[in-house]
Amino acid sequence: MKQFEGIKFIAFDLDGTLLDSVPDLAEAADKAMQALGRDRVTVEQVTTWIGNGADILIGRALSQSIELDPELDLALHQEARALFDRFYDEGGHKQSHLYAGVKETLAAFHQANIPMAIVTNKPAQFVPHLLEQHGISEYFVDVIGGDTFPLKKPDPFALHWLMEKHQLAACEMLMIGDSRNDILAAQAATCHVVGLTYGYNYGQPISASNPDVVLDQFSQLIDVVKLAC
């Protein structure tokens, strides 16, 4: 298995990488659709729709397809998004849970003094509470949401911002994610990238996006990142 040396910073996606959040996202999206008298959505559908941020998720729910309806009414879209945000917040994210090995692996990187960040397309307002709720907020020096900057993944803007802030060369940063947006962002930033097979990638294998390494379990990251003694 390939091993990365000289890694000084690790950036993580959130949904589908650290956290299985589909049940809560699907519930909020379904409630929003019901409130508007639209067709309901299922967990199975939402699993293939997430990864591009809440606006796109709700657009897909309204369109009942991964392809957005080009004639979708803007006012309806905005109302649906506001309802989704309300229901998602009111639900308290109680059905979401960390994947196996996440907390232990993050703790190991933290113990090895490797700074870490969250780079997610999820709206930033929801991220701090989720990290605190699952006891991992202390591990991250930066938390970047999908609306923190004007551009989100697959654009590399957030990764470039982190490299500039922490004075990193691209070869010193590692991105960990479960979708092609994560892989494309890392490749555009020319940093290393690991793709995880268990997350949400629009129903496609993550290997198709050609990450440097493909892993089936989060805990395997310890085997590919060479930690200082």
UniProtKB/Swiss-Prot annotation:
Pathway of action: Organic acid metabolism; glycolate biosynthesis; glycolate from 2-phosphoglycolate: step 1/1
GO cellular-component term (any): cytosol
Gene3D superfamilies, per the entry: HAD superfamily/HAD-like, Putative phosphatase, domain 2
Top-level class of the enzyme under EC nomenclature: hydrolase
Active site annotation, chain numbering: D13
GO biological process: carbohydrate metabolic process; DNA repair; glycolate biosynthetic process
Superkingdom as given in the UniProt entry: Bacteria
Keyword Calcium: no
EC number from the UniProt entry: 3.1.3.18
One GO MF term attached to the UniProt entry: metal ion binding
Keyword tRNA-binding listed: no
Catalytic activity annotation: 2-phosphoglycolate + H2O = glycolate + phosphate
Entry keyword set: Carbohydrate metabolism, Hydrolase, Magnesium, Metal-binding
Binding of Mg(2+), residues: D13, D15, D178
Names of the cofactor(s): Mg(2+)
Record NCBIfam families: HAD-SF-IA-v1, HAD-SF-IA-v3, PGP_bact, PRK13222.1-2
HAMAP family membership: GPH_hydrolase_bact
Family: Belongs to the HAD-like hydrolase superfamily. CbbY/CbbZ/Gph/YieH family.
Role summary: Specifically catalyzes the dephosphorylation of 2-phosphoglycolate. Is involved in the dissimilation of the intracellular 2-phosphoglycolate formed during the DNA repair of 3'-phosphoglycolate ends, a major class of DNA lesions induced by oxidative stress.
Descriptive protein name: Phosphoglycolate phosphatase
Biological source species: Photobacterium profundum (strain SS9)
